[in-house]
């Protein structure tokens, strides 16, 4: 055992037997290597582990040096929104589909993780967005997002009208099905499907991508990540909401605005030593290979 990481947290929400098998294999291997291991409570219950340290995501964030998330990008997003509040490194073993955020190959995870635990890895900081639904007379409702914050109708798809202010200066009004506000991390997710640009992770930028706008002149906009975005609504409707990473929904009541800004904390994401962002893009998106 080395001094880079002493306490390892095992995180995830296993939906398939293969993911559960990976959790168990990882737990046994880390214990055999002499690491202190803390297991998320649901995983310990599923594996029927007795007399082992368990905890919530918050407890893991407070106590562990590294959290290993087993699952797909959805699992990673759900865990990372909480873990980002703490000074903890996060890495993922891919048991999902695309796996933009979960780098470790499940068939070779232990060897790759061994290198990481020995200090041979690449680290980067990914910023989050903070979304507030607020009105002067009402208490704020706040959530965070690693990928994107999406304005959309709550139940039935329909055109909505809204105004966008950037740093309290009017930018544009829009009639569309909604708006995607994305981080660089989220630029390869929902935003990409809506025609948004791909931003490399180190860019301090946010994209605003219209969803089915009513005019052809509406185009994606890239702004500095230090900007504050305010959404105002010309026709009040009770069925509007914003969603964070397609996992948390905040309803918008009459008279309320939405404020979106860069979060004060970052996700400490680490990758295997041979990680390449552009190689990941090429592989996941099916880009063509080198010509010569």
Swiss-Prot record:
EC number: 2.7.1.23
SUPFAM superfamilies: NAD kinase/diacylglycerol kinase-like (SSF111331)
Catalyses which reaction(s): NAD(+) + ATP = ADP + NADP(+) + H(+)
Statement: the UniProt record of this protein carries the keyword Cytoplasm: yes
Required cofactor names: a divalent metal cation
EC supergroup of this enzyme: transferase
GO function term, MF aspect, one: NAD binding
Residues annotated to bind NAD(+): 73-74, 147-148, 158, 175, 177, 188-193, 247
Active-site residues, record numbering mapped to chain: 73 (proton acceptor)
Keywords: ATP-binding, Cytoplasm, Kinase, NAD, NADP, Nucleotide-binding, Transferase
GO BP term (any one): NADP biosynthetic process
Subcellular location: Cytoplasm
Annotated disulfide bonds: none
GO CC annotation: cytoplasm
Family stated for the protein in its record: Belongs to the NAD kinase family.
Function: Involved in the regulation of the intracellular balance of NAD and NADP, and is a key enzyme in the biosynthesis of NADP. Catalyzes specifically the phosphorylation on 2'-hydroxyl of the adenosine moiety of NAD to yield NADP.
Stated name of the protein: NAD kinase
Source organism per UniProt: Salmonella choleraesuis (strain SC-B67)
């Amino acid at each position: 055992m080395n001094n880079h990481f002493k306490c390892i947290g095992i995180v995830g929400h296993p939906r398939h037997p293969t993911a559960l098998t990976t959790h168990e294999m990882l737990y046994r291997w880390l214990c055999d290597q002499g690491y202190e291991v803390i297991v998320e409570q649901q995983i310990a219950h599923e594996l029927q582990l007795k007399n082992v340290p368990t905890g919530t995501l918050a407890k893991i964030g407070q106590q562990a040096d590294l959290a290993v998330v087993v699952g797909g990008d959805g699992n990673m997003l759900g865990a990372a929104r909480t873990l980002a509040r703490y000074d903890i490194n996060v890495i993922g073993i891919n048991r999902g589909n695309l796996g933009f955020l979960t780098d470790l190959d499940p068939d070779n995870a232990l060897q790759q993780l061994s290198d990481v635990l020995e200090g041979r890895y690449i680290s980067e900081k990914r910023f989050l967005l903070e979304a507030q639904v607020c009105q002067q007379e009402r208490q704020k409702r706040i959530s965070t997002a690693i990928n994107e914050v999406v304005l959309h109708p709550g139940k039935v798809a329909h055109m909505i009208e809204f105004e966008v202010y950037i740093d309290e200066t009017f930018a544009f009004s829009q009639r569309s099905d909604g708006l995607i506000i994305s981080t660089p991390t989220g630029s390869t997710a929902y935003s990409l499907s809506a025609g948004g640009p791909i931003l490399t992770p180190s860019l301090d930028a946010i994209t605003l991508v219209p969803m089915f706008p009513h005019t052809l002149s509406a185009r994606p906009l890239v702004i500095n990540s230090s900007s504050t975005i305010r959404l105002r609504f010309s026709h009040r409707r009770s069925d509007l909401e914003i969603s964070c990473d397609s996992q948390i929904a905040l309803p918008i009541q009459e008279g309320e605005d939405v404020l979106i800004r860069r979060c004060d904390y970052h996700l400490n994401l680490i990758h295997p030593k041979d990680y390449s962002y552009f190689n990941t893009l090429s592989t996941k998106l099916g880009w063509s290979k080198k010509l010569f």
